[in-house]
């Protein structure tokens, strides 16, 4: 059943900037990291990817999804159709999650190409591949909350919420013992053992406590659990009744 809704949602992204972002954002990230520090390229690229570019891309995908629906019919087309609204909401989340995964694959592909273009470039190994998968898993929770914020408060609010949350809150707590209390710190924290870089961008020395892989399982579990909770909670607001209440409040 969900497959039908996912296909329908995916078609809405046809010939849109959202699909182009899957290629554009990873490329911008790679170029930016190369210009910043070509001598420490791999670790720097993944550091910027986890702190800035990945959160911004997820927020943009969510905001653009909302913007497209709002411009098309202000969700009236969906609300007036004989569909299960919670399935539509889950499909929206699923499509953005798949696009996020696709961007990780594209990003990894660009990194593989770089090792053939630049002779001094370090080879891609299993931990680098694991870093991509971990980044995807630990950012899944951002999708339902950014979709909800985009519908509730608008395009800019969703982007600023996720970007500032990662840059400010994520970096602040990622290296602390209480990193697990802050969802934005999860993807940044798991980059420490996988890529060997501190959240502030400094390479970690061998034996540094931050290089311990013990943080990876709880980060993944916490993200998946929070993702499931937020997806279920936010689906309740996806209804014409809630939209009418919002319109009345704005009018008043």
Task: Go through each PLM region and give its residues.
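Aromatic- and glycine-rich beta-strand/loop motifs that create alpha-glucan
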Residues: 1-23, 240-252
